[in-house]
From Swiss-Prot:
Keywords: Calcium, Metal-binding, Repeat. Ca(2+) 2 binds at residues 52, 54, 56, 63. The lineage of its organism: Eukaryota, Viridiplantae, Streptophyta, Embryophyta, Tracheophyta. Ca(2+) 3 binds at residues 133, 135, 137, 144. It comes from Oryza sativa subsp. japonica. The keyword Aminoacyl-tRNA synthetase does not apply. The gene is CML23. GO terms for molecular function: calcium ion binding. The keyword Calcium applies. Ca(2+) 1 binds at residues 15, 17, 19, 21, 26. Coiled coil: none annotated. InterPro entries: EF-hand-dom_pair (IPR011992), EF_Hand_1_Ca_BS (IPR018247), EF_hand_dom (IPR002048), EF_hand_pair_protein_CML-like (IPR039647). This is Putative calcium-binding protein CML23.
Length: 151
């Protein structure tokens, strides 16, 4: 399953000390790095309690993948209810996707932002993309763009 492989890669990046487990601290730090926002202690503890099936206070890879899969499934149900938002996001994505590759590259992001009056260099655009580039390919797919816009 491709999504599961992607979640496993994300798990590896969250597991900063390489012990095969994600602590509440690692989860909080990675959410901040990914979304640029702090997650309140209560939310971190609630997620940990929800997913920690063996009760050790840590998330192993299997627990993490199950949590993310369930969260994604819940998100899919909510997305079905909001077709207009999705249509608008697709239109916005098409404006940023200028190279015909079906994704937003650092260069296409730079060009569109310049048209909108914000002048960033390619490295700054790469950093923006990196925050939401879940599969690590250096570009934003529509799903990654949607995640960024909904954050």
């Amino acid at each position: 399953m491709v999504a599961s492989d992607e979640f496993r890669r994300v798990f590896g990046s969250f597991d900063q000390d390489g012990d095969g487990k994600i602590s509440a601290t690692e989860l909080r730090l990675c959410v901040k790095a990914s979304l640029g926002e702090d997650m309140p202690d209560e939310e971190v503890q609630a997620l940990m309690a929800l997913a920690d099936t063996d009760g050790d206070g840590l998330l192993d890879e299997e627990e993490f993948v199950r949590l993310v899969t369930e969260m994604e499934a819940d998100g899919d149900e909510e997305e079905d209810d909001d077709d207009e938002t999705c249509r608008c996001l697709r239109e916005a994505f098409a404006m940023y996707e200028m190279e015909g590759r079906g994704c937003i590259t650092p260069l296409s992001l730079k060009l569109m932002l310049s048209k909108l009056g914000t002048h960033l260099d390619v490295a700054e655009c790469q950093a923006m993309i990196c925050r939401f580039d879940m599969n690590g390919d250096g570009v934003l797919t529509f799903d990654e763009f949607k995640t960024m816009m909904m954050a």
